[in-house]
Amino acid sequence: MSTLEDGFPADKLFAQGYSYTYDDVIFLPHFIDFSTDAVSLSTRLSRRVPLSIPCVSSPMDTVSESHMAAAMASLGGIGIVHYNCGIAAQASIIRQAKSLKHPIASDAGVKFPEYEITSLDAFGPSSFVFVEQTGTMTTPKLLGYVTKSQWKRMNYEQREMKIYDYMKSCDSSDYCVPWEIDFEKLEFVLEDKQKGFVVLERDGETVNVVTKDDIQRVKGYPKSGPGTVGPDGEWMVGAAIGTRESDKERLEHLVNVGVNAVVLDSSQGNSIYQLEMIKYVKKTYPELDVIGGNVVTMYQAQNLIQAGVDGLRVGMGSGSICTTQEVCAVGRGQATAVYKVCSIAAQSGIPVIADGGISNSGHIVKALVLGASTVMMGSFLAGSTEAPGGYEYTNGKRIKKYRGMGSLEAMTKGSDQRYLGDQTKLKIAQGVVGAVADKGSVLKLIPYTMHAVKQGFQDLGASSLQSAHGLLRSNILRLEARTGAAQVEGGVHGLVSYEKKSF
């Protein structure tokens, strides 16, 4: 052994019987002979779904719906639409995501007809509140709108009325433009119509609403790379399904609207139910990639690989809103889980999604270098403009709800299937409901994050994911476990106060 060797190879570090998280380990720097711009983050979600960046949005009902899926695809990643809703609703979300050629999530509020506007907070930073049947943009018809100036002129008695009683109608075709309109033409139409917003329609259904302010905001975002586009020329979108008999009907509807990959969504994927569903999907839809999980051991992974999965999802109890390890006493530290599962998956060429535990760009670097092909993000993307739900204000902070799919609130709505639950029996929570701060748009957040990831790869001497995996397997990349003091030293410390900005 050379006296110049530092640290440990990964196989030795992860064989010591400890369950490591991302913060527990640190990579040692290697040799740099290329620029940051030379780093390629291109990868695969599954066997036949290529991505330009290794980013996947989690199938959670407070993270991934149409705007998130379209935005992730436009950046070169992909979104996985949750299934905590009816079959028709999930299919509608996928259809809308594929129709969002311009993935612009408006800053304007969207309310249901019976809503009462009690303060200007309902408008957020926008001049509009739009009225839609369910209070979201996932159903096909916009009913009307209210402007901030209009509401300010109303007296107190009028403000107690339902929004439907005083909104302005959007029925006029003057507001509508085709969904496939070019961005430059869209900007011109907004200026020409002098109405402040336009409604994008496809086959008579509302796809999106875009305001002048939205256009100006998006123009200030970093330019994105090649998007994730499918053979049909539209954004590639993934979807989560369960393993029950009813999910076979759900899958049929999703295939009909063009879903590009399906994730079998289970907190413990090594089950007879998932093995049977994998075989059903591969037999019925052989051209559709199916991703199995969640798993954290090589044994679990091997079972799903032998059943025919095209990708694996790794993580159990590592998410910020997940309490599985606490409640059920099962799981694994995410760094250890990713390394172990990737070791067996690499032998079969199966891409691995590292799901959970991602709080910063450093965690993404660690997950990818340890063998993952992509990272799945929940809390990292929750609170963004594209995440479902409206903003609220708490102690002067702009926040959005974020809940675990194992929380009682989500399980009551239907996600108990993910935890192999039965709606007629007791429900045991494996997650919590919380809130996260406003993060702005993922169209800005992700490009800056990916640049930070590239810098991490450069420091490690890896110009691509494939290069990083090769350096790790050949024991050239070295790691060390971090003591508690080392973790403190590696963060901001010794200051009375500070302001931390990522970009």
Curated annotation (Swiss-Prot):
GO terms for cellular component: mitochondrion. SUPFAM superfamilies: CBS-domain pair, Inosine monophosphate dehydrogenase (IMPDH). IMP binds at S320, D355, G356, G357, G378, S379, Y402, R403, G404, M405, G406, Q430. It comes from the Eukaryota. Its cofactor is K(+). It is an enzyme of class 1 (oxidoreductase). Its main location: cytoplasm. It catalyses: IMP + NAD(+) + H2O = XMP + NADH + H(+). It is found in: Cytoplasm. NCBIfam families: IMP_dehydrog. Belongs to the IMPDH/GMPR family. This is Inosine-5'-monophosphate dehydrogenase 1.
